[in-house]
Structure formats: C-alpha cells, structure tokens
C-alpha cells in the first residue's frame, strides 16, 4: 500500500464529494447523528475554490484518491473546514498522516496552529483529535473568529452542546 499526501489539483476535485459522502456513512452507527450520512456536502465548485487557493490536500493509496482535507485561514490559524476519508480507508492511519502533513505545510507557511470544530463524543471526532495532540478549547476562551464558526454551525442546525472547538499548536 503506497500512500501519497500532497496538494489537490483542480482536475482531482471532482472525486472529492464522493469521498465525503462515503465518510459520512459512518454516522449511520449513531442513530441521533444518522442524518449526517445524507447531509449537504462540499460541492465540486467549492472544492475547486479550495484547491485554487492552495487550501486542499489529498490522500491517495496506490494513486487512487481516498481522502482529503480542506482548510481556510482563520487569523493565525489554519482552520480545518473538512477532513474526510472514504469509509473503506478509515481506521488505517491515513487521516492521522494527512493531518501531520497539513500541519507541517501550515507550519512552513507561518500558521501558529490548526483549529477545527467537531463532535465532542463521537469516537472518530474529538477523542481521535485529542490523541493526535489537539486540545479542546473552552467556549469562553475562543478567539472571536473561532467563536463565530461555532455560532455559524448552530445557526445551520448543529446542536451547539454536542460540538466543540479544538486546537493543535504548531511549534
């Protein structure tokens, strides 16, 4: 198994929505979150914008796309907007490696941290990120831009109390 991590090209963006849709199927294991399996995903046009901005990274196995991470600048942090791995490739360390790769890219570009929002108690969400070195941030200490991300999620139907913001400091 040959794993490649690199920036996403515009030509590869068409494959990314299917990866996100597959990744969401894992939420069928949690009845109260099963709706995520059919929730709105990032469009090809949105993926093209992330890639054009240099904010999309791809994980490939034997030259076949299996995962991606898209991000945006949020102050001095690189905010992970979405990390998805095809269901078949989850649990094999590819996501961990992709986060490590993007962390190194972010460090080289001068970002001070990686940030994200995620579910507090879903095993492959906050508990996994904590094992990778991310720390959960208390709502009262959130920087304004990250607080706004949390509020935007709630405005779009996410239950505020079920989610959290996390940060990985880049040294």
Q: What is the predicted function of each stretch?
A:
Residues 4-18:
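A short beta-loop-alpha structural element at the N-terminal edge
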Residues 21-46:
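Conserved GNAT-fold acetyl-CoA-binding loop/helix
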Residues 58, 64-72, 79-84:
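Conserved beta-strand in the GNAT
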Residues 83-90, 118-120:
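A short, internal acetyl-CoA/4′-phosphopantetheine-binding micro-motif in the GNAT/acyltransferase core
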Residues 85, 91-104, 131:
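Conserved acetyl-CoA-binding loop-helix of GNAT-fold acetyltransferases
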Residues 106-118:
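Conserved GNAT acetyl-CoA-binding A-motif
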Residues 116-125, 142-147:
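Conserved beta-strand-loop-alpha-helix junction that forms the acyl-donor binding cleft
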Residues 130-138:
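Conserved acetyl-CoA-binding loop of GNAT-fold acetyltransferases
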């Amino acid at each position: 198994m040959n794993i490649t991590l690199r920036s996403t090209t515009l030509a590869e963006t068409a494959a990314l929505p299917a990866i996100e849709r597959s990744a969401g199927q894992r939420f069928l294991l949690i009845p109260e979150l099963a709706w995520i399996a059919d929730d709105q995903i990032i469009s090809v046009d949105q993926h093209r914008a992330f890639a054009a901005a240099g904010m999309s990274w791809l994980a490939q196995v034997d030259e076949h796309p299996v995962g991606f991470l898209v991000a945006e600048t949020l102050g001095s942090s690189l905010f992970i907007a979405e990390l998805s791995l095809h269901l078949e490739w989850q649990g094999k360390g590819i996501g961990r490696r992709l986060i490590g790769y993007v962390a190194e890219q972010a460090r080289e570009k001068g970002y001070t941290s990686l940030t994200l929002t995620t579910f507090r108690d879903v095993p492959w969400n906050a508990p996994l990120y904590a094992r990778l070195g991310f720390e959960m941030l208390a709502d009262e200490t959130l920087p304004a831009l990250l607080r706004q991300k949390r509020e935007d999620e709630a405005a779009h139907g996410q239950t505020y109390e079920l989610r959290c913001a996390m940060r990985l400091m880049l040294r």
